[in-house]
Amino acid sequence: MNSGAMITLSVDAEAEQDRLKTTINWGNNTDVTYGGKLATVARFSKTKGRSPILQADIDILPTEVVLNDTLWNIRSSHVAIDSGRVYIDNFLFERPGQYLRVDGKITKEETDSCIVDLKNVDVQYVLDIVKFDDVEFGGLATGKVFLKNILNKPDMKTRLNVHNFAVNKGLMGEADIKGVWDNELPGIRLQADIEEKNLSSTRVTGYVSPKLKALDLRIEADSTNLDLLTPYFEGIFSELDARANGLVRLHGGFKTLDFEGGVRVKLDTKVDILNTYLQLHDDSVYIKHGEFALKNARLFDREGNSGRVTGALRHKHLKNLTYH
């Protein structure tokens, strides 16, 4: 969501004896609508004994939510809170052909678990939550996330398929993603295998840490689509059609990302300042902190004329590109 958007929020609460009915309404003022209502009825009680503990039984009522102009339904479900333990009974957030379902126990016990079940959920919804908005992701995720011991030493494993996985609107293919929570980071260690059928394959390994707001990913490219770089080259190149083979590391804070490594590139693109199209047929691009460099590379135009070039595109964390 646009960070400059205005969000309106209202909370209505009605208490009667040991019962509390709460309704939360929210909305925004942007061209794309985010808004809706969450309604609950909570009943409170205390355990018996010398040190009574507050317990809560919460009924989640059916309501509607709009995300990115799309209507979703919150279905009836139940949550119980008892002695620091949370029991979730079939929370369901859905629309035709898509859903997010949560069921299980959130406790300090190693034997208790919670399952998050996804079907065709837009991956950008998830990344919006952790404020990772410098890179735009797309695709529909299906699979399960298994959670254990959440309130003590979290244990998380996931296996997701992402249909039409895209980065900065550049289609990467079908993604098979495996993830495991690492308490030492803390963050998610992942392996993603991404394939465009009969075109390319890409393997990504490394970690993403929402807490540190940082990532470190090793990218093994085999004819990988480079459309994902289009936003960073705006004003210099346009109509980019490029694929790469090689090894690249993407690392840094979410706001201070950088690349290093080396790839061989096939490229056809318009150089805006020259108003002409240039090509690399299969040449090396050398990548280091703040720089993409060519060394005596052969460039072609679309008529087959060629010449040699040595130069570099320099940047500051993928912003403010200049060429030398």
Report residues per predicted region.
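Interface amphipathic segments
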Residues: 1-324
